[in-house]
């Protein structure tokens, strides 16, 4: 991983350690010291930084909660971080972010050490019924550190760890794919555009892992995740360009839902467009949905964009999207996420 403050290693949160607090003005630092002493702590000041030990995780949480509550009305902007027994320092954080970061030590450990694995959901070629790729979906690595992926990413965003988690997840997916998939099988991997503030810098570690594990860049498809709002189209275009210059494919997810519009598809011109389940569900019984899908396919064809129907849960849906001219399909009817990839072809026998 890189050593920048956005996606570099962060200190683990142990049972004992030392907080480091600071404020821009001397008066603010005096208020921090007064608060800590009033609470029975033993702060020491070194230059502009105030050091105060904690002797349990519960004490650490109480200390930050109390400091935030007491100084909220003072107008003092407090920043803080901590060091552990290995004397690892993290960059200074706003107090509100620090509070979130230490609120779930297990989530912090999961992110910092990459304590997760990935399940794979098959994607089929509708013309040949062959499994052409797998989408990688984050899952807990063990029952010791359990989590729901959505909750983990929500915590990461609030704790200013989104870039760390996104980078860890990308690299882990690539490593996982190298162990389980043959060359020529596409690997669909999610990414958060806002976590990649400088594509040429932030993606170095990703491309390094691709090379180290002997993965063909053309087998990779990086897709914008469903929860990510597209605020800066030019930035996303720059990310797509960086991926494509390296030989990697890109995809726009959840077309037809929220910010992922057909106009956005035409503007970004990804290699793949993934149509949201809201347009696929019971499309066999909805002529309006079918017409929307037809128009979407026509506009994608102009730009040579391969179209994938997501969320196929019924045979009838599969038949309709195939008839309409979709290239690819994915969903529970085809195959559920699994820790081991499905066979090389899909059959409706027994379904």
Residues covered by each model-derived region:
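Glycine-rich beta-to-alpha transition loops that act as phosphate-gripper elements at the mouths
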Residues: 123, 253-259, 306-315
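Active-site core of bacterial EAL-family cyclic-dinucleotide phosphodiesterase domains
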Residues: 95-154, 337-338
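Catalytic core of bacterial c-di-GMP phosphodiesterases, primarily the EAL and HD-GYP domains
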Residues: 163-235
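Catalytic-site-adjacent helices and loops of nucleotide signaling machinery
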Residues: 149, 158, 252-265, 318
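EAL-family c-di-GMP phosphodiesterase catalytic domain
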Residues: 1-90, 94-99, 130, 226-229, ...
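Conserved, mostly hydrophobic/aromatic
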Residues: 129, 169, 173, 189, ...
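Structural preference for beta-strand elements that scaffold enzyme active sites
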Residues: 117, 135, 186-188, 219-223, ...
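Surface-exposed amphipathic alpha-helices with a cationic face
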Residues: 210-211, 237-249, 294-301, 322
């Amino acid at each position: 991983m890189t050593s920048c403050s956005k996606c570099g290693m962060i200190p683990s949160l142990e049972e004992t350690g030392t907080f480091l607090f600071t404020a821009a003005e001397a008066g603010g630092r005096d208020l921090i010291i007064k608060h800590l002493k009033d609470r029975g702590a033993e702060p020491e000041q070194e230059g502009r930084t105030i050091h105060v030990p904690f002797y349990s995780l519960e004490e650490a949480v109480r200390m930050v909660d109390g400091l935030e509550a007491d100084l909220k009305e003072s107008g003092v902007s407090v920043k803080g971080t901590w060091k552990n027994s290995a004397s690892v320092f993290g960059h200074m954080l706003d107090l509100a972010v620090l509070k979130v970061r230490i609120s779930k030590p297990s989530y912090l450990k999961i992110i910092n050490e990459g304590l997760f694995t990935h399940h794979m959901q098959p994607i089929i070629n509708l013309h040949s019924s062959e499994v052409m790729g797998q989408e990688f979906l984050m899952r807990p690595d063990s029952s010791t550190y359990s989590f729901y992926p959505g909750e983990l990413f929500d915590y990461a965003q609030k704790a200013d760890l989104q870039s760390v988690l996104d980078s860890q997840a990308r690299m882990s997916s690539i490593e996982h794919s190298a162990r389980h998939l043959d060359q020529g099988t596409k690997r669909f991997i999610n990414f958060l555009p806002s976590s990649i503030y400088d594509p040429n810098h932030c993606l170095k570690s990703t491309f390094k892992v691709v090379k180290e594990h002997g993965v063909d860049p053309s087998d990779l498809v990086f897709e914008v995740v469903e929860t990510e709002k597209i605020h800066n189209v030019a930035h996303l275009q720059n990310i797509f360009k960086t991926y494509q210059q390296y030989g990697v494919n890109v995809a726009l997810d959840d077309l037809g839902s929220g910010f992922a519009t057909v106009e956005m598809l035409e503007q970004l011109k990804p290699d793949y467009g993934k149509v949201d389940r809201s347009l696929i569900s019971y499309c066999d019984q909805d002529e309006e949905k079918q017409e929307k899908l037809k128009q979407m396919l026509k506009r994608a064809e102009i730009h040579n964009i391969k179209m994938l129907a997501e969320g196929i849960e019924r045979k009838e849906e599969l038949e309709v999207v195939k008839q309409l001219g979709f290239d690819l399909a994915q969903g529970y009817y085809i195959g559920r996420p699994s820790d081991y990839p499905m066979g090389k072809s899909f059959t409706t026998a027994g379904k």
